[in-house]
A protein has these predicted regions:
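Non-catalytic, surface beta->alpha helical segment in thiol-disulfide oxidoreductase systems
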Residues: 71-106
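Short active-site neighborhood of thiol/selenol oxidoreductases, capturing the structured segment around
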Residues: 14-26
C-alpha cells in the first residue's frame, strides 16, 4: 500500500532519495487503474501519493492539472512526470531514463520514504 502524503509530510518525503508521487483522487477511475502498477513499482523505487481533493495546494505547487499524474522527485526537485494511464513497462523505462543508473540501484531496499 502506498503511503499517503499531506501538507505536513510531503516536503520531508521528497527531500532526499528518489520517490515517485502519485497525484490522485478517489473518484478518478484512471487513478485506480494505475494503482496496482504503482504498488508493483514500489520494489524498484519508493512510491507515495497525494489526494488532490484533500491537498490541492500541493498539486498546485507542481502544476498538476490532470490526474493521474505521477511525478518523480529527487533531492526535493521534480525530475519528471507521467500524466495518464501507462503500462508498467512505460514507467520502468521512464525511471531508467530519468534516474542515473547508480541511483536506481539499491532503492528497492529502502522501502517507503521517511517523513
Amino acid at each position: 500500500m502506498m503511503r499517503e502524503l499531506d501538507d505536513e509530510t510531503f516536503d520531508a518525503a521528497i527531500a532526499a532519495a528518489p520517490v515517485m508521487v502519485d497525484f490522485w483522487a478517489p473518484w478518478c477511475r484512471p487513478c485506480k487503474a494505475i494503482e496496482p502498477i504503482l504498488d508493483e513499482l514500489q520494489g524498484t523505487v519508493p512510491v507515495a501519493r497525494v489526494n488532490i481533493d484533500e491537498y490541492p495546494e500541493i498539486a498546485s505547487r507542481f502544476d498538476v492539472f490532470s490526474i493521474p499524474t505521477v511525478m518523480l522527485f529527487s533531492g526535493g526537485e521534480a525530475r519528471g512526470a507521467i500524466v495518464g494511464v501507462r503500462p508498467k513497462a512505460h514507467f520502468e523505462k521512464w525511471l531508467a531514463e530519468v534516474l542515473p543508473a547508480g541511483e536506481l540501484d539499491g532503492l528497492a531496499a529502502q522501502g517507503q520514504p521517511d517523513a
